[in-house]
Design a protein with these regions (language model features):
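Conserved catalytic Walker-motif region of ABC-type ATPase nucleotide-binding domains
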Residues: 99, 220, 334-336
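A short amphipathic helical element positioned immediately N-terminal to and/or at the very start
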Residues: 2-15, 115
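A hydrophobic transmembrane-helix motif
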Residues: 38, 134-176, 228-275
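Transmembrane helix-loop-helix hairpins at lipid-water interfaces of multipass membrane proteins
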Residues: 2, 20-72, 152-157, 267-271
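ABC-type nucleotide-binding domain
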Residues: 327-548
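Cytosolic ends of transmembrane helices, especially the final helix of ABC transmembrane type-1 domains
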Residues: 189, 212, 236, 283-311
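An intracellular "coupling" helix at the cytosolic face of ABC transporter transmembrane type-1 domains
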Residues: 15, 104-105, 121-130, 134, ...
Length: 548
């Protein structure tokens, strides 16, 4: 799983392969200098002829080698960080783009905070993997092998003693599965924490109104401690290992120094050999000691990337069609349509309904009868399990999603507004609109006068989800947004439920005016709105029981 996930990560790094290649080359140069420098030091110390030109050349070469090593380290680190950061951005962009194509049922089963964590925190772990963990692991392995060879070249018995003292450190690999599982648990707990925080911050008004501050403090506070507990569980194996690694590292150095001193006394080693050997020991234990940290980072990064890839692997059930819906007239046909949400009763039961272009139809019925579901099927937020929905005689599954939705405007009871300006929110449905068109749509939605009364007019910032506006104002803004789009099909789902009677009358007159030549479906409980319709369709238990 680890190798498969790492290989998948690097498919996103392809645009930056040149930078990564240069970074790897620079890293290999650093390794080469690290392996070469102790030999130069040995030659310098073993020079018995005094300070000669050869000694000067060796000393200058050693200084230049260390200078070059510093430059190559800077090049390697800079390029690897640049490539890893942009690789993370590529993954995040891909995951987010995929999330936009997923059906509503996917979001119904998941919480916003969890999904945000997968796109942000989990993917961010990849940066450490690409920039540090993998390069460090590769360089440490190569360095350890190179140092081992060099030590055996210098003195076989001393090299053998060194390897024997380091064997216990290699047991770190036995803990990989436990660590990976622990870090996955930590990321899951972090997602739960973010979800609760997001939900609480959005519902702060209700928390205060119902005096639930203490309850929520306790509930959310528990998630902080849950994350701390799982994080501690993930790192405690390394807390056990670190003292052991340190002990065996020190033990090896003591043994080597003692054995080396004995060999110098017997004449089997020169002073230069011992100095070179001690330098190699530092290089040898360094990579081995760092192995635990790099493995920890790899485990964290792979666990985080796997959670992000789980989203990317979710199937897209709403497939795009190939037919571009140009200049449709608005004939809508439901043919024996059946639909149910996951793990729920049947919402629509073999409904057949024909709506000619230009007709205004009111859909009425009890809550849960299936009225809103009919509208959602038209814009393909869901697809029916049975039957077919057609527009102008063409199955809407054959249309491209973009062209289909460009021909439909919808105003829902649950209005969503972005945190920008009023102008930005209205123009969200049609970015190339003129200001005159924006004014006209706002007037039809009976909100233009209110907007002009504000200090900044259409440039007024409305806050997150339009928090600075009342419910009725938010609804009228959404109506203006739908009117501006000027689509041949208009869907109104309890669009005036939050406005007063006078404002509703103004909006009704506007709907009557703009509905000429358009197909309009109105979901409503208000008799005043029903009276404006050409037809009234009554739905009960997912079936049409009256059509007049």
């Amino acid at each position: 799983m680890i190798i498969k996930t790492i290989l998948r990560i690097f498919t996103f790094a392809k645009p930056y392969r040149v930078s990564l290649t240069i970074s790897v080359i620079a890293l290999f140069m650093v390794i080469g200098i690290n392996l070469f420098a102790p030999m130069l030091a040995r030659d310098l110390i073993d020079n018995t002829d005094g300070w000669t030109n050869q000694a000067t050349i060796i000393a200058v070469t050693l200084v230049l080698a260390y200078l070059l090593r510093g430059i190559m380290q800077m090049v390697s680190n800079t390029l690897s960080h640049w490539a890893s950061l942009y690789t993370c951005a590529q993954i995040q962009k891909k995951v987010y783009a995929h999330m936009q194509k997923l059906p509503r049922s996917f979001y119904a089963d998941r919480q916003t905070g969890e999904l945000m964590t997968r796109v942000t925190n989990d993917v961010d772990q990849v940066e450490e993997l690409v920039s540090h963990a993998l390069p460090d692991t590769v360089s440490n392995i190569i360095l350890a092998v190179g140092v081992t060879v060099a030590m055996f070249i210098i003195n076989v018995p001393l090299a053998t003693i060194t390897l024997l003292t380091i064997l216990p450190v290699l047991t770190v690999g036995l803990f990989q599965k436990k660590v990976n599982k622990a870090f996955s648990k930590m990321f899951k707990d972090t997602a739960t924490q973010n979800t609760m925080l997001n939900e609480n911050l959005q519902g702060i008004r209700e928390i205060q109104l119902f005096n639930k501050q203490g309850h929520e403090n306790e509930r959310v506070g528990n998630t902080f401690f849950a994350v701390a507990k799982s994080a501690f569980h993930a790192i405690r194996w390394y807390s056990f290992l670190s003292p052991g690694i340190g002990f065996f590292t020190s033990l090896g150095q003591v043994v080597v120094i003692a054995a080396g001193g004995y060999m110098i006394a017997t004449g089997s080693l020169t002073s230069g050999d011992v100095v070179a050997f001690l330098l190699y020991i530092g290089l040898f234990y360094g990579p081995i000691s760092a192995l635990s940290n790099t493995l920890e980072t790899i485990q964290k990064s792979v666990a985080g990337a796997s959670r992000a890839f789980e989203v990317l692997d979710q199937p897209i059930t709403i497939e795009d069609g190939a037919v571009v819906a140009n200049a449709i007239s608005g004939n809508i046909e439901f043919e024996k349509v059946s639909f149910s949400y996951e793990d729920s009763d049947v919402i629509l039961d073999h409904i057949s309904l024909s709506i000619p272009a230009g007709q205004t139809v009111a859909l009425i019925g009890a809550t849960g009868a299936g009225k809103t579901t009919l509208l959602n099927l038209i814009i393909r937020l869901f697809d029916p399990q049975q039957g077919k929905v057609s527009i102008d005689g063409t199955d809407i599954k054959d249309y491209t999603l973009e062209s289909l939705r460009n021909n439909v405007s919808i105003v829902s009871q649950d209005v969503f507004l972005f945190s920008g300006s009023i102008r930005d929110n209205i123009m969200y449905s049609k970015q190339d609109s003129t200001i005159e068109e924006v004014y006209a749509a706002s007037k039809n939605a009976a909100i233009h006068d209110f907007i002009m009364s504000l200090k900044d007019g259409y440039d007024t910032i409305i806050g997150e989800k339009g928090v600075k506006l009342s419910g009725g104002q938010r609804q009228r803004l959404a109506i203006a947004r739908a009117f501006l789009r000027n689509s041949p099909i208009l869907l109104l789902d309890e669009a005036t439920s939050a406005v007063d009677e006078e404002t509703e009358m103004e909006i009704r007159r506007a709907v009557i005016d703009i509905s000429k030549g358009r197909t309009v479906l109105i979901v409503t409980h208000r008799l005043s709105s029903i009276s404006d319709a050409d037809r009234i369709v009554v739905i009960k238990n997912g079936r049409v029981i009256s059509d007049k």
